[in-house]
Amino acid sequence: MSSVAIAFLCALTLGSLRAYAAPDSDPCSLLTQQQVGAVLGTNVEAAHRIAPKLCEWSTPSQPNSMNAKKVAITISNERAYGFAKTPIVQDIKAIAASGICDDAVYSVASGVPVGPNTSLYVKKGASYFVVHVYGFPDQSKVMGMEKTLAVQACSKL
């Protein structure tokens, strides 16, 4: 095969990778202010894009801390999802979550206050995202809230 043909095939392959990559998503578009407020049981401020792949909804007039009532959604990737499903650190355990998109798993860290210790990793097709609910001391309640929000977010993908 000539070097021109090889170069053409490489360019074609590299150029088409973008077509098969996970779609870029705006994390703030996955939930509405009303959906988040209904799940948290309180009014929340409009979505605030913290970073290109991170969006946060928080209750007004609260200190900016991990204990404040808020929701964060992060656009993730297959690698992070794989680590959540099969943790390599013994202080983190994976708990299967059913009825959410194509697949989902809770990542729960031990030795961390409830709220910041639970994250819900979700997969739908080639898209991945993570839901975090903060500010509630009951872990099972946090997990239920994360599930409700994840199911709602899945409908937007």
Which residues make up each language-model segment?
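N-terminal "mature-domain start" segment
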Residues: 19-58, 94-96, 127, 137, ...
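Small/flexible residues
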Residues: 11-12, 20, 71-72, 81, ...
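A short, solvent-exposed beta-edge/loop patch
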Residues: 87-157
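Bacterial N-terminal signal peptides
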Residues: 3-16
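Short, solvent-exposed recognition patches
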Residues: 34, 38, 42-115
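Generic N-terminal leader/processing signal
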Residues: 16, 67-68, 121-122
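General secondary-structure edge motif
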Residues: 16-18, 133
